[in-house]
Amino acid sequence: MIEERFDAIVVGAGMAGNAAALTMAKQGMKVLQLERGEYPGSKNVQGAILYADMMEKLIPEFREEAPLERHLIEQRFWMMDDRSHVGMHYRSEDFNEQRPNRYTIIRAQFDKWFSSKVREAGAIVLCETTVTELAQDDRNRVVGVRTDRRDGEIHADVVVLAEGVNGLLGTRAGLRARPAPDNVALAVKEMHFLPRETIEARFNLKGDEGVVIEAAGTISRGMTGMGFIYANKECISLGIGCLVADFQRTGQTPYGLLDEFKRHPSVAPLIAGSEVKEYSAHLIPEGGYKSIPQLYGEGWVVVGDAAQLNNAVHREGSNLAMTSGRIAAEAIGLVKSRGEPMSATNLSIYKKMLDDSFVIKDLKKYKDLPPLMHTHSENFFLTYPQLISKAMQNFVRVDGTPKVEKEKASLKSFVKTRSWSGLVGDAYRFARAWR
């Protein structure tokens, strides 16, 4: 056993874990961070979106040092059927600001840099170290961790679980249940490399401008899921994900969906001639507010994806992860400054602080949307995209048919497929869940 005792042990070196370790180290706490990968980010080859406001609270000068790809000036949403898409997008020169609001990043590069800042702050970071279980005393209080290293048991006043959505430590220790299949999505992603000037021409970009495309519709074959495309400097991050429960129910494969997505007429021209160099699969928490587990206990707290903190409606995850990690660290620091033990009662302040933040407020607002989308997935991800595409094509095609007849034909198509009661019911349920 390692004799040295730590104020805190952080399990995981992703966004949430790094935020927690950095914040505690800056407070002067003795922090040990454990990561099973070869280096932080080694298991995160995919692209992602970084939200500047949350990063600034951790490292104000990050723009000067961090490996950033492009700042986002445009957001597109596509509702797709097999041959077309109906789009909505927002683009503004206001996002070409001195301190941009959002960036695309490559997680393998960014997480490695982020971890270097954790080390600079004074934390000890051990990679290639797997935490096998939580160490508990005879009163079931968490007092440290056990690892696969020779001197495997390490003690600390508190353990921060930042092990990701599929982390097993809390489950093995009986602290929380394993996420249900209908609360977790499996996403598959590829990195398509192209010359920088080709990417900028295809996406109408200049300099370091970036764009993100999010897509829903028949690409998920009636399952609850979405596709995405991020423009980076010299590559395009492309992927698709659906709920694990839906993959189990339908027998569809994520790889098959990804291949179909890449062949779609709206997507194929964007990646034509590209070279695929990286491929990954990743589990994402999708259950929202109702799936959040117990966030604290005797000697432990849980943050980020491990706490199911992901806004599936707005596709926000890294900002919730960083914020929860920072708030957990601040709560731990507050308990320590009072000279109090890391008991469940004292650590409950973490939940209070998180409840007062945008993290829980946003998740609570949309608490009914994830189950609604899952329960009525065939309507929202298959039927309506097909109906809307057909109606739009009818609307823009000029063939001598009077407009009033076109409108009646489109309405008749909706009513025939879903009925008046179905249409009204879907609209009511969606509006109620959105409010």
Curated annotation (Swiss-Prot):
Key word Flavoprotein present: yes
Pfam families referenced in this protein's UniProt entry, alphabetically: FAD_oxidored (PF12831)
Cited InterPro entries: FAD/NAD-bd_sf (IPR036188), FixC-like (IPR039651)
Signal peptide: none
Annotated function: Could be required for the formation of a functional nitrogenase Fe protein. Probably accepts electrons from FixA/FixB and reduces a quinone.
PANTHER family: ELECTRON TRANSFER FLAVOPROTEIN-QUINONE OXIDOREDUCTASE YDIS-RELATED
Protein name: Protein FixC
Primary gene name: fixC
